[in-house]
Amino acid sequence: MEREQDTARYIALALDLGAADAVPFTPDDIVFEPRTILKCMFGCEDWGKGPTCPSRTGSLMPWEYEPLLRRYRWGLIVHSPDKKTAQEASFAIEQRAFVDGYYLAFSMSDCACCPECVGLKGKPCAYPKKARPAFHSVGIDVFATARGMGLPIQTLASEDEPQNWYAAVWVE
């Protein structure tokens, strides 16, 4: 009963913060796919620069996250057409869950803390306690996961098209 109540409160929090959707998941709902690193390595101009990306020294490789994340029993997927909203909602849920006793709660979201990432310029991250790895950078197929949960996502022909941003909060 407590989990159901907490889930409902966290969903309400995400929606109150502007998320379009917040959907509960178990690790079995998440599609782990180590090939996601190829999109980072050969599709991201920030490869080797981002303070939360898998290219940074000492970072786990995407396929090394799966056994860690499978130890969680449940969490929430947060969807928003706005990257910053997805990050802020997921981080707020992580903080609330921690206060509620879920001390290992952990959020993942494309970082939108700064208008322009200072880490990409070789400077220390301005928000090291808030910056998190992107959902896809840890070996998760965001497209297959979102589609499996009935959430909207498609490839875009242009960056001007409406976007779907996803974050995850691993609660317990």
Which sequence ranges carry the predicted segments?
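Auxiliary alpha/beta "docking" domains used to position bulky ligands
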Residues: 1-172
